[in-house]
Each structure stands twice: as C-alpha cells, then as structure tokens.
Design a protein with these regions (language model features):
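Binuclear metal-dependent hydrolase catalytic cores
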Residues: 2-221, 304-334, 352, 370, ...
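Generic secondary-structure boundary signal with a strong preference for alpha-helix termini
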Residues: 64, 94, 236-237, 345
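A short, polar/proline- and glycine-enriched secondary-structure boundary/capping micro-motif
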Residues: 88-92, 231-235, 348
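Cap/insert and terminal regions of metallo-dependent hydrolase folds
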Residues: 210, 216-219, 227-325, 419-420, ...
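A polyampholytic, Gly/Pro-enriched intrinsically disordered region
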Residues: 336-351
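Protein-protein interaction and targeting regions used for scaffolding, dimerization, and localization
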Residues: 358-363
Length: 430
C-alpha cells in the first residue's frame, strides 16, 4: 500500500489533506451549522457565504452565482448577484437596505440578474442612498457595466416611477465604478482598510474580470468565469481563500443528466470555463489556505470523480462552494466551513438603529430620523377614473376592523436613541 503524506505535516487523526488550522474560529457558536442571527462576526474575522452557486439551469438548492463577504469592521460586500441569490441573502438575515457594494465579474445574466429585481425593493426597504456597483468595461462603451446599468434603469422605468410615491430618497440612483477590463491588478475599491483589486479574464468575450479583496491581513479571491490563466496565478499569491469557478469536464455523463450534446458541452468549457483538473492546478500554483470551487452544476454522484480530478494536482484543503449556502469563517489562525440553516419563509430582517445609520450613511446618531419625502405622489400617476372605480372598503371590511384609509404618504419619523434604549432593555431582559 502506497504511503500517503499529509502536506501540512499532520499526525494521526488529521487526515491526508486537512491542515492544523482547519478548525472553528473562536467566534463560531455552532461547529456544524451556521444559524443566521445567532453568531456575530469577530472583529478580526472574515466570513464568506455562497448565497448562489449555479450557472444554468437554476436548481432549488442552487441560485445564480453570488458570494457575500462580511468583515469584522462591519463592511459587507457582494461579488456577483445572480438570479435568486437575494432570496438567500435575506434568509441569511441581511436587511434588504444593506445589500450594497456589488462587484460584478462580467455581464452574463447569471451573475447580475437579481440587480434589477432588488434595486427598487431595497430602496423602498430603507436604502435611501444610491446603490454602489463596480464592474468592468467592455471593448466598446455599450458593452460595459455603466451601459448595462443605464439600460436596466430604462427597463425599470415604470417600476421606478410607480415606487416613487414611496419614501425612497436617492435609492433609485446607481453609482457605477467602471474600470478598464484590460487593467491588471488595478484598484477599484479602497476604503476603511479594505482594498479590492481586479484583473482581466479570458471568458469568450472581452469584459470579464476577477477580484481580490484584502483586509486586516486576510484575503479572498473570486475568479469569476474564465479559462485558467497566468494572471490569476500571479495576483492570487498569498491569498487565504481562493475561489474558482469550475465546470466538470465530464461531457458524456453530463449529457446523460442534462441533455447537452457532448461537442457543445466541451466547446463551452474549452472556450469559457475552468475544468476541474485545471481547478486543482490553480490551487497547486497559488497554494491558498483553502481552495474552493463554485459556479457549477453540483452533482453529488460525481463528487468523488471531480475531487479525484482536482487531486491530480492539489493535495491541500479543498471544499465545494456549493450547494447554497456554504459558509466559511476565516481568521489568521483558523479556517472553518459549515452549511447555513435557513428558514423557508426568509422574512426580511428589521434594521437595527445602528444599521439604519449605516444604510443612511450617517456618522453620528441623530435625535430624530425622518423618512425622505415622496418624489412622485400617487395622485399624479393615475387617471381619476381608475381611482373612482375602486370598490368602497366598507363593502368588504368587517365593521369592527374598519379604519381610515391612508391615501397620502404621511411624514414618518422616529427617535433613534429611544429605539436603541428599548432594544437594549429587551436584550437585558431576555
């Protein structure tokens, strides 16, 4: 029997691929599952959640690709925002108003399809400041992130105008940071001790990029889609968490499962994607503390074969970033992975007073916070006849619960300090 050596020099009971730092961080409350709302992130911790992991077709347990990165300084980032990912983000306990700072790798719809869906609703839910979106240019202006956002707002014209009879402030505005897709290791975000860099990827068409986030001695790379390339190896050196997209190079088997003709399946991989053998090669060349793969049709029956392909190059720590929602906690001395336990209903979490300030981009706690005024009143958006044909509510509402209708948006204000004191009292009594 061949002798197997743990690359991390582990002893008995450590396995053949697990490092000594593969252990719960000191902030982890449950070693087996992540329960949203029951575990605060540590001040020196990074938490990465795969809130979407699938390209096509979408599955009940795999939304379109999106990776949520939380930092111990309170910052929150989203790398891609694929179809259905907002459902998981809300189920993870993130108030809708805090879904911001979105970094798009490229403009295939499975990487940003939830952007038009969430724009008006998160503004209505308290995000009264502009949405911040970062992404690559295209070969021509009409193919870049800014052009996509412009056309998206045109597409949403009816929705945005109708919702303007609600207090949304500047929430419908989108501040786009579009960088030159050709730029190598350029900085597209630098704030609050966080730096995000980017570099180009080979993915069928010009305008695809990878990202690297660095903060407090911790780092994360998301390759986005693309062929395995030398720039990714170069700019991912020293990273803690390296996440590559991956497609199973198993055309015959995938054809049986999904109906793709093998030549078409192979062509898509060979011109657009990273096969599982190449994922292992990238891990070996980069040597991250943990290598992960997502943006894949997760087939449990093929796990062993895919891992075997990865192991032809990489004998270190590897975990799938699929299905939804895999959670990774990272500190300088520990890396730990779990699956999130999410509620079926996924009701949106209420903003705490501190989160209200964050969403409103306020530095100090005001005595009173007031909702922004309505920009386009309801009565200016409908012809009088349609209002007149509404059925009188007294005909369908039981008498004991009838109330005066609110037909004009009233001013809404609340005392932030009183709210904070009341919440603290509830916590003290619980």
């Amino acid at each position: 029997m061949a002798e197997t050596t743990n690359p991390y020099q582990g002893g008995p009971g450590t396995g053949i691929s697990l490092p000594p730092y593969f252990k719960p961080t000191k902030y982890v409350k449950n070693n087996n599952f992540f329960y949203p709302g029951l575990e605060e992130i540590g001040p020196d911790e990074m938490r990465i959640s795969f809130v979407g992991s699938c390209p096509w077709p979408p599955r009940r347990n795999q939304a379109g690709t999106s990776i949520m990165v939380e930092l111990g300084n309170g910052d929150l980032f989203f790398f891609d925002l694929g179809n259905g990912s907002v459902h998981n983000i809300i189920a993870m306990g993130v108030p809708p108003a805090l879904i911001n700072d979105i970094f798009i790798t490229h403009l295939h719809a499975d990487h940003y399809a939830d952007l038009p869906y969430m724009l008006p609703f998160t503004a209505m839910a308290g995000r009264y400041k502009p949405l911040r979106v970062t992404g690559p240019s295209g070969r021509t202006p009409r193919l870049g992130t800014q052009a996509m956002v412009n056309k998206m707002r045109e597409m949403l014209c009816w929705h945005l105008e109708e919702f303007d009879n609600l207090p949304v402030g500047d929430g419908f505005e989108v501040n786009v940071t579009e960088f030159d897709f050709r730029e190598e290791n350029g900085i597209c975000y630098e704030r609050n001790g966080v730096t995000v860099r980017h570099w180009p990827r080979s993915h069928g068409k010009d305008g695809a990029s990878a990202y690297r986030l660095d903060w407090n001695g911790l780092s994360f790379v998301w390759t986005g889609d693309g062929r395995p390339d030398e720039l990714t190896v170069k700019y991912s050196q020293g990273v803690d968490v390296f996440v590559t997209e991956m497609q199973n190079d198993l055309a015959q088997l995938m054809s049986m499962k999904s109906g793709f003709p093998p030549p078409l399946y192979n062509y898509i991989i060979d011109t657009h994607h990273t096969p599982h053998f190449a994922a292992g090669y990238l891990f070996k060349e980069i040597n991250p503390r943990i290598g992960m793969a997502t943006h894949m049709e997760y087939e449990p029956a093929l796990d062993a074969e895919v891992i075997a392909g990865i192991r032809t190059h990489w004998d270190g720590l590897f975990v799938f970033g699929a299905p939804d929602v895999q959670v990774v906690n990272v500190t300088k001395d520990a890396v730990w992975t779990r699956e999130a336990v999410l509620p079926e209903l996924g009701n949106a979490s209420r903003l705490t007073p501190a989160q209200v300030l964050k969403a409103a981009e306020l530095d100090e706690i005001p005595d009173v916070f007031e909702f922004p005024p309505v920009n386009f009143p309801r009565e200016e958006q409908r012809i009088e006849y349609l209002r007149e044909i509404e059925i009188d509510p007294s005909k369908y509402t039981p008498k004991d619960v009838q109330r005066d209708l609110v037909l004009e948006m009233p001013p809404v204000r609340f005392n932030v300090r009183q709210m904070m004191a009341a919440q603290q009292k509830m916590q003290d009594e619980s």
